[in-house]
């Protein structure tokens, strides 16, 4: 039997504990909790299948965002073009339990909310795709033309500009 250096080394876990040699090898550690996982995946069962809203392990389902377009951005003016041209890179699945299945991940603040608007992102003439935005993020924006506070009645354009319905018609 051939010994590897990892078999002889003490293993430090992310929580600060140290395990004696041979208990863990680097190829079978959960990347989140550091415990041994033999499922061939980077995360153990508990870390991989946990509700992302309440933390429950019961009755889990994997939910695709209904819009198929989630992205990690905060300011749409900076990232909307990148988001639209490379949407497949931002597709995201999330795990929710049966109690939290109605929550939606807001594409702007990346928090889970029950009340979200499905907003279309527009080119000049037509909507290109849809993303879900929570009420809190929706009300943060003002119309780029008249500076009135936004509501659910706004259009977000591919170039990042936001217009209220009144200014968009003009």
Curated annotation (Swiss-Prot):
Name of protein: Cysteine-rich uncharacterized protein 241L
